[in-house]
Amino acid sequence: MISDMKIIAGRKKFSAIIIVMLISALLLQGCGLFKPTAASLTAKMLKELQKVNSAEVNTKIDSLIGVKVKSIDVGMEMNLGIDNKAEMTKDPERTKENNTLSVSGFGQNVNINYEQYTEKAEDGSKITYVRTEGTPWRKSTEQKQSSEDASGDGSADTGSADTGSGKKPSAFEMIGLLQKAGDTLKDAELKQELVEINGKQAYQINASVGGNLVKELISQSNAGSGKNSIDLESIDWDSISIPTELYIYKESSLPARIKMDCAQLGGEILGNVIADKTENTMLEGVDFEFKTFDVDITIDRYDEIGEIEIPAEALEAEEAGSVEELIPNLSNLF
């Protein structure tokens, strides 16, 4: 009996040793069982992203638009660009942004620089403060949408004019875009080689994002006003595919960068806006085409941002009645 027990104990020890050796061998050899995959990396990224309290978000949008006048068969090109550098905190919910909007083409080059703060008030409303070069601060208040309005009757009275502040996603929405993109990646492929982002090693995942993600983002961005400048239902979102490169920091598992080729999406949206806004105008006979539309978002300095203080003169600013009042020089771009 004792002999049998010794044999069983010996076998258990031997089995345990074999298991340890097997696991060690797998780890040392880099067996696929323990290698990160696109799915495992994005799943962990989404989990870690929920814990973030602050970050620095830099967004660049570069686009090239072809313009053709049908009546005289003349073609031209126009560059549109946005360079946004932002800091964000979750508690309190605030952002500080420096923006440059640029347009070049038709023999001219125009830039508009403006500073912007946003905060979520205690009543749930979103307040945006903006100052362009040489102008005083202006603010826009977007009231929180009531549950009745959220049901979709489109009758929301926001208490302020439609300034269009929701049309450019905030730094928080950029984070949300990363989160949603990571959750809806299609045909994801993890590259074998690590790359360097902001001096840190990162994984690269190539994939595509469906158009319905963008539809949801646009809807959420404009939810407070009860309006959309784009007829979302007239666009075939299912046919839109956005080639995407997602980079995830190796050490922290947090998103480092996302690059999106939005040329197809831009073409659909531009066509929608042009059809709605140019009927019976001088632009009715003009064709527009997005030749390139690249979005590049980089995130760094997670949980390193201190409290964002909104300047006193911004807090005391007058309410803007339109987007032209909020950003006075905007019309100079066109």
Question: Predicted regions: what is each one?
Answer:
Residues 3-18:
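Bacterial N-terminal signal peptides that target proteins for export
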Residues 28-30:
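C-terminal motif of bacterial Sec signal peptides marking the signal peptidase cleavage site
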Residues 32-334:
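Subset-of-secretome marker
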